[in-house]
């Protein structure tokens, strides 16, 4: 394969990304040096505005996998990725209206605290451990996979980029906390958009303008976006993307620690919701840029596909190879695109490190040592950031030894997200579900999603369901085509062409629905949770959204939870919501007499104030 090496200006532009990201961490370390509470470090004192949080949310979940993978996906399969714009609408709506209000008003820092308040400690710890394991694994692969693709095309040093990513992310996470992560993400989001725009402008000029791009893409069937085939085995259809994609991304947005931690860092609930809705705009922009990049790339390589001809060895290398071609005479711009790709990586890794440190501190350290001083709590949080930074970087090294297992590791994020979504849905929406149902549902959902996913890796779906659109090598000057003959499998199990051939976008739906169904059944078999024993602020009464329902039907759907009782209204009116100190309620078990006021929360304003007395240590 022909490797086009970086020039000096490319390295300068790329290095600038790391220098500025580190500088933001140093800035917030100096600016916030007198504020040493864990609350300031982990959730920014709950005083963030919606703007930077919205940019941070978008950057955190639009990783280098999106920057490199989505254009390659469009190049091979067409522009059906545009349908994810519909999925994102449902995801943001359900997150902001169903999950966020409960998490924000509760005053929790770790989303898994809710599981102890609603169920018990074993459920909380089981969910936390699953989250930690899958996040470390996923983050390691997110660091390694794009670094490998860029190395093989641009000659950019593989391990230098891997370790630089790990070191820089760990550096600014441990120095500046959540504020540094959010503002660095905002900067990296701008870099991603600028990088995409340069590719779109230069790429469309190379192929004769945007109209020419659309014409060639249309002739190549790349603009066939909507396919209403209801077959769940088809890789991408309208239904798999809008329904399966909603479940997949709701597992990432609705109950993921990285998302919720940013939302609860906002100064009011309104700001948190605005952050989510403005983040929707960011998601649309990034996906649109990625899709159009794929269409331009197809127009450029229409008559000589570098993948089929053997010039590159994997689809993920298409985008870097394309960039090196169109910017061959423009030093610095290839470096800008690599900075764009690594902005996605940096933001994802930083979000993961910060979230991992938060859940570990809140769910394990604080539970074992509830009376830590603020200064010691902050230092422990910083130490956890360093620890998880090392672990995620080490996981990238392990990923290099995995071979074909890398694809499986990338899917674990979705495979775990579905059951976790089901678990929180059981807690928020179904008051009668008890802790046995929750734990049994989680295990059932994990089992189902891993079963179908692992089966699909061992027995790939028939080519008729996953075959890419036609690619041509007709006008290639030099061909080095390697034909791989698929091994003949003597026999396939009965489930291979049905259950194991399910579209990967349904993995989360299988896990979520399996968790919910099992949780409800187990709760009925073991004795339902009595509604009157559950604090109403732990439940989100979905039926209340239907304003035309009579109070009689709404009360019936409350399943005994006293949403209209005077006590609940008193909680909201007097500034009292849950606990007299979150830790007190968690340590004593969830009893009505332990649910008191959260310091600093004003339910009328739905906001947090920094005016509450807080033990602050000055260096």
From Swiss-Prot:
Main location, first listed in the record: membrane
Pfam family, one: SSF
Bilayer topology: Multi-pass membrane protein
Topological domains annotated Extracellular: 1-9, 69-80, 150-157, 202-235, 297-321, 407-411, 459-504
Annotated InterPro entries: Na/Glc_symporter_sf (IPR038377), Na/solute_symporter (IPR001734), SMCT2_SLC5sbd (IPR042700), Sodium:Solute_Symporter_SSF (IPR051163)
Reactions it catalyzes: (S)-lactate(out) + Na(+)(out) = (S)-lactate(in) + Na(+)(in); nicotinate(out) + Na(+)(out) = nicotinate(in) + Na(+)(in); pyruvate(out) + Na(+)(out) = pyruvate(in) + Na(+)(in); propanoate(out) + Na(+)(out) = propanoate(in) + Na(+)(in)
Membrane topology (Cytoplasmic): 31-47, 102-128, 179-180, 257-275, 343-385, 433-437, 526-619
Induction conditions: Up-regulated by CEBPD.
Tissue expression remark: Expressed in the cortical region of the kidney corresponding to the proximal tubule. Expressed in Mueller cells of the inner retina (at protein level). Isoform 1 is expressed in the retina, kidney, small intestine and skeletal muscle. Isoform 2 is not detected in the kidney, small intestine and skeletal muscle. In the kidney, expressed predominantly in tubular epithelial cells of the cortical region and in the convoluted portions of the proximal tubule (pars convoluta). In the small intestine, its expression is highest in the proximal part and gradually decreased towards the distal end.
Positions annotated as glycosylated: 219, 480
PROSITE patterns listed in its UniProt record: NA_SOLUT_SYMP_3
Subcellular location: Apical cell membrane
Gene3D superfamilies given in the database record: Sodium/glucose cotransporter
Cellular component annotations (GO), alphabetically ordered: apical plasma membrane; nucleoplasm
Swiss-Prot/TrEMBL keywords: Cell membrane, Glycoprotein, Ion transport, Membrane, Sodium, Sodium transport, Symport, Transmembrane, Transmembrane helix, Transport
Family: Belongs to the sodium:solute symporter (SSF) (TC 2.A.21) family.
Function: Acts as an electroneutral and low-affinity sodium (Na(+))-dependent sodium-coupled solute transporter. Catalyzes the transport across the plasma membrane of many monocarboxylates such as lactate, pyruvate, nicotinate, propionate, butyrate and beta-D-hydroxybutyrate. May be responsible for the first step of reabsorption of monocarboxylates from the lumen of the proximal tubule of the kidney and the small intestine. May play also a role in monocarboxylates transport in the retina. Mediates electroneutral uptake of lactate, with a stoichiometry of 2 Na(+) for each lactate.
NCBIfam families noted in UniProt: sss
Protein's recorded name: Sodium-coupled monocarboxylate transporter 2
Gene: Slc5a12
């Amino acid at each position: 394969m022909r490797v086009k090496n970086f020039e000096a200006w490319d390295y300068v532009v790329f290095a600038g990304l790391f220098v500025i990201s580190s500088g933001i961490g140093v800035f917030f370390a100096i600016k916030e040096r007198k504020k040493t509470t864990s609350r300031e470090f982990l959730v920014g004192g709950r005083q963030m505005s919606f703007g930077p949080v919205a940019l941070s949310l978008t950057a955190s979940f639009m990783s280098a996998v999106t920057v490199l993978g989505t254009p390659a996906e469009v190049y091979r399969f067409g522009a059906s990725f545009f349908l994810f714009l519909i999925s994102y609408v449902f995801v943001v709506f359900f997150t902001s209206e169903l999950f966020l209000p409960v998490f924000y008003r509760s005053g929790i820092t770790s989303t898994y605290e809710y599981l102890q308040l609603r169920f018990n400690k074993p459920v909380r710890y089981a969910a936390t451990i699953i989250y930690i394991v899958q996040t470390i694994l996923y983050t390691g692969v997110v660091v390694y996979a794009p670094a490998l693709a860029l190395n093989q095309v641009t000659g950019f040093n593989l391990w230098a980029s891997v370790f630089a990513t790990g070191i820089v992310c760990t550096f600014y996470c441990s120095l500046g906390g959540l504020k540094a992560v959010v503002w660095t993400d905002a900067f990296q989001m701008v870099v991603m958009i600028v990088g995409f725009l340069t590719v779109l402008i230069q790429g469309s000029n190379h192929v004769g303008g945007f109209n020419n791009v659309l014409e060639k893409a249309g002739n190549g069937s790349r603009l066939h976006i909507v396919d209403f085939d209801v077959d769940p085995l088809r890789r991408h259809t309208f239904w798999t993307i809008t329904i399966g994609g909603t479940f997949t991304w709701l597992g990432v947005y609705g109950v993921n620690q990285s998302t919720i931690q940013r939302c609860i860092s906002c100064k009011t609930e309104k700001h948190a919701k605005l952050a989510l809705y403005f983040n929707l705009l960011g998601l649309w922009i990034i996906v649109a840029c990625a899709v159009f990049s794929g269409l331009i790339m197809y127009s450029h390589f229409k008559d000589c596909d570098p993948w089929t001809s053997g010039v590159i060895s994997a689809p993920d290398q298409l985008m870097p190879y394309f960039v090196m071609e169109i910017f061959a005479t423009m030093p610095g711009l290839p470096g800008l695109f690599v900075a764009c790709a690594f902005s996605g990586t940096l933001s994802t890794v930083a979000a993961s490190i910060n979230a991992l440190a938060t859940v570990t501190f809140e769910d394990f350290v604080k539970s074992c040592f509830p009376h830590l001083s603020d200064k010691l709590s902050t230092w422990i949080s910083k130490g956890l950031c360093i620890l998880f930074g090392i672990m995620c970087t080490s996981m990238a090294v392990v990923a290099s030894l995995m071979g074909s297992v890398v694809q499986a590791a990338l899917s674990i994020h979705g495979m775990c997200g579905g059951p976790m979504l089901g678990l929180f849905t059981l807690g928020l929406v179904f008051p009668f579900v008890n802790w046995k149902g929750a734990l049994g549902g989680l295990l059932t959902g994990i089992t189902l999603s891993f079963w179908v996913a692992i089966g699909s890796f061992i027995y790939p779906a028939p080519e008729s369901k996953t075959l890419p659109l036609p690619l041509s090598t007709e006008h290639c000057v030099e061909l080095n085509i390697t034909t791989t003959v698929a091994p003949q499998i003597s026999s396939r199990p009965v489930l291979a062409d049905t259950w194991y051939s399910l579209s990967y976008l349904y993995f989360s739906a299988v896990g979520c629905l399996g968790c919910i169904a099992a949780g409800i059944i187990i709760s009925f078999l073991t004795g339902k949770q009595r509604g009157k024993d559950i604090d109403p602020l732990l439940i989100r009464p979905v039926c209340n959204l239907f304003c035309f329902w009579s109070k009689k039907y709404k009360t019936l759907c409350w399943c005994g939870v006293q949403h209209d009782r005077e006590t609940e209204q008193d909680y909201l009116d007097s500034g009292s919501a849950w606990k007299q100190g979150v830790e007190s309620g968690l340590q004593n078990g969830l009893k009505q007499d332990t649910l008191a006021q959260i310091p600093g929360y004003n339910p009328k304003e739905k906001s947090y104030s920094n005016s509450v007395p807080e033990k602050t240590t000055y260096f």
